[in-house]
């Protein structure tokens, strides 16, 4: 069972990682191509392109300027410990045991605008380059054009290494668009999380992001290996709804918080 998640805008490079064990991203040569494009952008260009404040634009211009593929554990951090958004609150990587971290390294993959596809222990430098960014590059008008079939093929290789065909898509639409579902060799399962609000069940972004992270952690903790086992997910008040589910979209509901 392979799990796909999105990265996070919020980063933590202050706290030391819980382990020195690390790996290097598979697509650093591609990352360097993108960095070279980004290094030609002014802070004003970045502010417009990424729709961010001047301060954040300046910070990212500096990050692009300082980026080097020859980084190490001394100045970088493993992705699973560096990302600190809602999804990663749900994953709660700081409480993983060494055995759980090993399973996470095997089963979890993080889609990234800059790095392509990351394993949890892959070292990254601070960056911000969302997959939906319309960054013109030698391969096209945006990052979807840049990555092309590369990430789909990488996911297929990871699925083959797992030994089963299940792909659990817990990534956002923005990031999963970088993968071509029809070319995947595995069975794609996309869980849906809905909370009760104003008289109906609906997807609420903040809660859904955290739920995706909690499900990723649940799969690791419980060593889930089938869709039926996945349906038993009951963390933080969520429960499986047979009525609202579709064959490859199991739906989980939660009452008003």
Curated annotation (Swiss-Prot):
Q: Where are the transmembrane segments?
A: none
* GO terms under cellular component: cytosol
**GO aspect biological process, one term:** response to hydroperoxide
Please report which protein family the annotation says this sequence is part of.
Answer: Belongs to the UPF0246 family.
Official protein name in the record: UPF0246 protein Shewmr4_2963
Organism of origin: Shewanella sp. (strain MR-4)
* Classification of source organism: Bacteria, Pseudomonadati, Pseudomonadota, Gammaproteobacteria, Alteromonadales
